[in-house]
Amino acid sequence: MNKEEILEAIKNMTVLELAELVKALEEEFGVSAAAPVAVAAAPAAGAPAAAPAEEKTEFDVILQEVGSDKIKVIKVVREVTGLGLKEAKDLVESAPKPVKEGVSKDEANQIKAKFEEVGAKVEIK
């Protein structure tokens, strides 16, 4: 399997399948996917003034407020992230907290819509 075939397979995966893939890669290689995202975001902060003219391509979805129906919000967190029940509950209870990082604008808006349907307040950065 070459690089292009791998990328094509990843493009055809659902968000849940991608979350499972990331978790499997983390376990297999003993790494954390969170570290490279933070490192990749750091150079943008020190970029020259010309950089802000570029359109942002990666967005973070941050759960700001849970709203009145915490159980439905936990279900959406599990659906979006692929987290287990306890991890999703902990994330919801520690809001404001990033739910998904480094996603496309379309995906971020879809995630935001899912949370707003269940009464949660979400911010896209």
From Swiss-Prot:
The source's superkingdom equals Bacteria
Keyword Transcription regulation in the entry? The reply is: no
One GO term under biological process is: translation
For this protein, the parts annotated as crossing the membrane are none
Q: Name one Pfam family in it.
A: Ribosomal_L12
Mention any one GO cellular component term assigned to this protein in its UniProt record.
cytosolic large ribosomal subunit
Q: State the function annotated in the UniProt record.
A: Forms part of the ribosomal stalk which helps the ribosome interact with GTP-bound translation factors. Is thus essential for accurate translation.
Q: Describe its partners and assembly state.
A: Homodimer. Part of the ribosomal stalk of the 50S ribosomal subunit. Forms a multimeric L10(L12)X complex, where L10 forms an elongated spine to which 2 to 4 L12 dimers bind in a sequential fashion. Binds GTP-bound translation factors.
Please state what the protein is called: Large ribosomal subunit protein bL12
Annotated source species? Thermoanaerobacter pseudethanolicus (strain ATCC 33223 / 39E) (Clostridium thermohydrosulfuricum)
